[in-house]
Structure formats: structure tokens, C-alpha cells
Regions:
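Polytopic alpha-helical membrane proteins, predominantly small-molecule transporters/carriers
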Residues: 1-105
Length: 105
């Protein structure tokens, strides 16, 4: 499987575990807590697999960037976190950085 696709899946699992952390209420909800731990482990495993082919700095930055963008977007959509011009510009800057890293890797 393509290392970039694996890395994207790892990033999406990072978003899943971040949301799981929010819903687990400090790991006091067992089912959601198990989901969260599985997502954490899966995210780390996939990141590790992607590192067989991708440079560490690039892969880590993309992985974190996907997590930041995904969790920020879900925070705005699900929990009414602030939506303002500078927040959107910052998210777009992260996205452009991810695209730049992909194009230069």
C-alpha cells in the first residue's frame, strides 16, 4: 500500500482518538475509552509503517497536521468552538504546509 495513503489513515485515526478523548470524559466511559485506545494504537502503528518509506520530519509533520486540521474542524462543527478569520487562515496555512511537504518529499 502507498506510504502516503497509510500516513493519511494514521492522521485520520489521530483525529478519531482526539474526538474519543473528548467523549470519554477522562476515560470514565469504558466503550468510548476502548475505542480511543484502539485508535491511538492504530494511529501510531500506521505512522510507523509509513516511516519505512517517508522521511521522519515530513511524515510526522503531515500526521500532526492532519490531526490539527481534523480536530479543529470537528471542534468548530460539533462543540461550537470559535470560528474566526485568523483561525481559518491558520488552518489553511497548516494545510498549505502539508501540501508543500508532500510535493517536496
Amino acid at each position: 500500500m502507498n506510504a502516503w495513503l497509510i500516513l493519511i489513515c494514521a492522521g485520520l485515526l489521530e483525529v478519531a482518538w482526539a474526538v474519543g478523548l473528548k467523549y470519554s470524559h477522562g476515560f470514565t466511559r469504558p466503550v468510548i475509552s476502548v475505542f480511543t485506545v484502539v485508535a491511538i494504537v492504530g494511529s501510531m502503528l500506521l505512522l510507523g509503517v509509513s516511516l519505512k518509506k517517508l522521511p521522519l520530519g515530513t511524515a510526522y509533520a503531515v500526521w500532526v497536521g492532519i490531526g490539527i486540521i481534523g480536530s479543529s474542524m470537528l471542534g468548530m462543527l460539533l462543540w461550537q468552538e470559535s470560528v474566526n478569520f485568523w483561525r481559518i487562515i491558520s488552518i489553511l496555512a497548516i494545510l498549505s504546509g502539508i501540501i508543500g511537504l508532500k510535493l517536496t518529499a
